[in-house]
């Protein structure tokens, strides 16, 4: 007969005692695998992702200086408490053995260097001579580094901290950086004078307006007004809609041909970034394009994370879609990693929004967003506000080079209303159809253009 088990038994930790009781009741031997058998089975599986996860977990744990007891307290609060505690039963001994091995070899890893330096400063084993501490890219700071800076400030009351950062570009939570350290700077470091750098020498005013409005939809982001040296605003963000995945290559190539013509007329080589949320967005024909356009265009593919701090004349952001491998990403992190990461932000997709902002602002002249007709990203409707008309241009592959009339769907909020041709003529329909059936008549000016 079958033995019934439930997920509740697993979560409560009673699963194995229940199995033992039921097997004994059926006069069957209860034979748990020995540790050696379990290790042999794990060796057969050869799971680099599990090894990498444990390594990342230990690194983040050390960065935040968390003890096993603190981790268990957090695990007790997780939805799958049994899984979290079982994971700690594995990872804590590994962590301890790792530290013992480092000590035996008289070695330290990077996180230990930071932690040891912090301890030496606090215990005054090292008395620093510094009057000013300069920290760049402060939005990426993690708790371990912040603790070292704070220890140095506390050791010498005359020491001053000068930090430069942009909370709009904080995109490394997965590596332990905590945006709250910057957004709540006075809370962590005391009385603070803040100076805003309000001029940008990279993107034009059109890109700047769109990107700044988008990022500040999250009220937790610091409010800033940014002025661009280049005042251009017309058609600086272009949304390129395509029908099928195989259309992307021809769509991109067509745009590159146009940009190559511009480069020839300007008698210079233009720098072009192709950016992807994921590395698999890299076009298979990139090498061919580099060869074809080598005299006009300097082409480069980068992930959005790697593009931070860089700039190009024109930028194409690929795969601005919903669904699998989407942007914003809908891949859910393993809840176990939350045991050692900063507290998640309340605003939906907060870090993905900052990553999108980074992509938008890599361009000096124009940013192109490629989106699939049937999988339009939830970020796209936010760029189609009336005040941005003329700056943001929506181009449908079906309508050629002409700007398509589009607007955010008022019903679902994540789709867009655009021209659809039905049996009784054209009308405005939602891109989320059939999940959203909102429709309306064409605006008079668009109706007049229909044949």
Model feature map: region roles:
Residues 1-107:
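A basic/glycine-biased coupling hinge at the interface between accessory DNA-binding modules
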Residues 80-181, 199, 309:
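Conserved helicase NTPase motor core
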Residues 132, 264-271, 287-298, 302, ...:
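Conserved helicase C-terminal RecA-like lobe
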Residues 143-237:
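Conserved RecA-like helicase ATPase core segment
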Residues 191-193, 200-296:
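Helicase P-loop NTPase motor core
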Residues 409-412, 430:
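Short cysteine-rich clusters marking metal-coordination/redox-active sites
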Residues 420-428:
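Short linker/helix segments within small regulatory modules
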Residues 434-451:
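Short metal-binding segments enriched for Cys and/or His
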